């Protein structure tokens, strides 16, 4: 069995001017004009008299976050806004550990026990809509000139690597680059008609038993969260977006603004999951069954292909950690963009270096030879490192293969390496 993990870097080649990156989405959620737009749109749906935080207040909070962490990305900003919104919605100290911590801190500082902001409850949804609509705008106006060719190449890569056997595709990306590239390959989302209210929702039996599945553990533009603690799946992202907005006026299925209790605070991760504590999402459908299938897929695979992943999500990392120890023949193929020459000697000293992260996640050994004649350190497998720097592909640890030239180049030459 083969498992594919498509993460943020896998979508970059499909868009241009601008590209779909963390930086691009961060700039969008920081933009005062975006907050003015979505809050105005929200009021049109709910009525002008609705109580909601002003765009100016939301931007002030974001700027305050950035004053402490100037390089905060959109996930870090989401984390803080979600927690503020959780307390604003329900400040009772017995209703969540965050509320209790907040109340104790207020007592220690002699602060009044009031909410941190009026009308913040819907801000997490609007934050996620800024992200969703930014991606929809990219899909409308900024696709790469060879977008269709890239879809065909991605299709060919998956077909070549999966070799007609059982396979699972896990995508953390909200866009349509993965689903649009799977035509003819037999991958199933396993969303099935349920009733006239919820339309298409996950069929758990089909999903857990399908030989080929594709799933989105961080949510997707095609998802619409509903009031039965699940999502409805739409085949069209624009229609899904319209339904989410219509859900504000209760004219569509379910309840767009459904939130669920979490262990620490309320969980606002609904149709897409962001922030830095995503684990609460896996207590709700379809994410709960996604996580179960993901654990099974990784454990049952002989090869895992990882495209454009930063190795920053603990809920993925913990599932991959034992993979190489399950069978001596298991292997990992990682595709990323690494412009510098690889030495495989000192990279471990930088904990943020992707090579260092790979070593930590898979529990591999970092082997270095000391050349006493030259008084310097050399990689254990010198020929493989030389090949990697020359050709772009090589074995960096036992059974861990790395392609360093980026996903665009990989799609043009994957048959040379796999």
Where in the sequence are the language-model features?
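Short, well-ordered alpha-helical microsegments
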Residues: 154-155, 178-179, 313-317
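Residue-level signal for secondary-structure boundary elements
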Residues: 70-77, 89-92, 109-116, 135-147, ...
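Conserved glycosyltransferase catalytic-site signature
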Residues: 12, 151-155, 174
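SIR2/sirtuin-family catalytic core signature
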Residues: 1-28, 32-57, 68, 207-209, ...
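Extended, H/D-rich, highly charged conserved domains that either
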Residues: 44-129, 156-269
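Short amphipathic alpha-helical surface micro-motifs
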Residues: 152, 192-204, 254, 286-288, ...
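Alpha/beta-hydrolase fold catalytic core
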Residues: 125-151, 261-301, 305, 309-313
């Amino acid at each position: 069995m083969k498992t594919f993990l498509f993460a943020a870097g896998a979508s970059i080649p499909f868009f241009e001017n601008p590209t779909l990156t963390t930086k691009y989405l961060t700039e969008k959620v920081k933009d005062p004009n975006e907050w003015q737009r979505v809050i105005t749109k929200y009021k049109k749906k709910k009525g002008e008299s609705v109580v909601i935080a002003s765009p100016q207040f939301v931007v002030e909070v974001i700027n305050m976050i950035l004053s402490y962490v100037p390089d905060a990305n959109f996930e870090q900003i989401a984390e803080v806004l979600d927690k503020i919104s959780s307390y604003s919605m329900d400040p009772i100290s017995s209703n969540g550990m965050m509320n209790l911590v907040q109340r104790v801190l207020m007592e220690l500082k002699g602060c009044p026990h009031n909410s941190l902001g009026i009308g913040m409850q819907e801000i997490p949804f609007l934050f996620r809509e800024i992200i969703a609509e930014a991606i929809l705008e990219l899909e409308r106006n900024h696709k790469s000139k060879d977008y269709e060719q890239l879809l065909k190449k991605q299709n060919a890569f998956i077909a070549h690597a999966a070799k007609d056997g059982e396979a699972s595709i896990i995508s953390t990306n909200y866009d349509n680059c993965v689903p649009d590239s799977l035509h003819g390959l037999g991958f199933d989302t396993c969303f099935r008609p349920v009733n006239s209210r919820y339309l298409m929702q996950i069929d758990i039996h089909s999903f857990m038993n399908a030989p080929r599945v594709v799933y989105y553990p961080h949510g997707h533009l095609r998802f619409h969260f509903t009031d039965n603690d699940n999502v409805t799946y739409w085949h069209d992202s624009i229609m899904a977006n319209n339904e989410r907005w219509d859900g504000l006026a209760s004219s569509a299925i379910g309840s767009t603004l459904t939130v669920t209790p979490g262990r620490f605070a309320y969980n606002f991760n609904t149709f897409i999951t962001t922030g830095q504590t995503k684990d609460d999402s896996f207590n709700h459908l379809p994410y709960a069954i996604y996580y179960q299938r993901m654990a099974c897929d990784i454990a049952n695979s002989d090869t895992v292909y990882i495209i454009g992943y930063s190795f920053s999500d603990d809920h993925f990392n913990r599932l991959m950690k034992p993979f190489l120890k399950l069978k001596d023949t298991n292997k990992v193929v990682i595709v990323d963009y690494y412009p510098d020459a690889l030495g495989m000697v000192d990279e471990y000293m930088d904990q943020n270096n992707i090579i260092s992260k790979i070593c930590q996640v898979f529990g591999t050994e970092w082997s270095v030879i000391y050349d006493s004649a030259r008084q310097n350190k050399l990689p254990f497998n010198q020929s493989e490192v030389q090949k990697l720097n020359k050709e772009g592909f090589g074995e960096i640890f036992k059974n861990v293969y790395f392609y360093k030239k980026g996903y665009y180049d990989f799609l043009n030459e994957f048959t040379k390496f796999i």
